[in-house]
Amino acid sequence: MADLHAVTAITLDLDDTLWPVRPTLVAAEKVLAQWLRTHAPATAQGTPPPLMLALRAEVAAEHPQWAHDLSAIRLETIRRALRRHGDDPALAELAFEVFFDARHAVALYDDVRPGLARLAARYRLIAVSNGNAEVDRVGLGEFFSGSVSARLHGVAKPDPSIFRAACAAAGAAPHQVLHLGDDLDTDVDGALAAGLHAGWICRPDGAHASAEPRAGAHRFTDLLDVAAALGI
């Protein structure tokens, strides 16, 4: 396992690394459903959250070119639901914004804000996400120097190019960058394949807590653990 003395920048995944994403999305689906009950009642009645999720899977299967763009999939899902039930499909953009706003009402893990503060005091931090969350909208923008999203980059992790783009945003070579994330495949394997250091954020109560870490990767319980390992 490589040591971290050469690290000058840190890239971080967002969903399930800085906050649990499932409860956030479930709550956002409920907010969207409530909005639809007021503005598009036929759609709300005909497409409750479980059916909306099924429709979303249908749209994703029909549009593989959007695999890296969750916003495009969500918007088309809402538009299709409105059209199927005779409501105005032009409402889709407004409905999406309602969902997107609620999607950013995240509950940060307790270590995130103090951990980011310690890391940002020494390193440039770059967000790298396959999702559509934005660090400014979740109130963490002050800690980050930039972000690279799969939606804007055009491909998702674990593709090496998105990690290289994050390194460029940080102004550092891959061997100078530590990537932190919860997913062994997209975050850890992806970072290692792109030449970065990889830090697996494996929270004790997380879904992957019993999994074996990858060879060559560092294992951390949270961001404060990362800061301690880096001597800050």
Mark where each language-model region is.
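N-terminal helical cap/lid subdomain that shapes the substrate entry/recognition surface
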Residues: 3-110
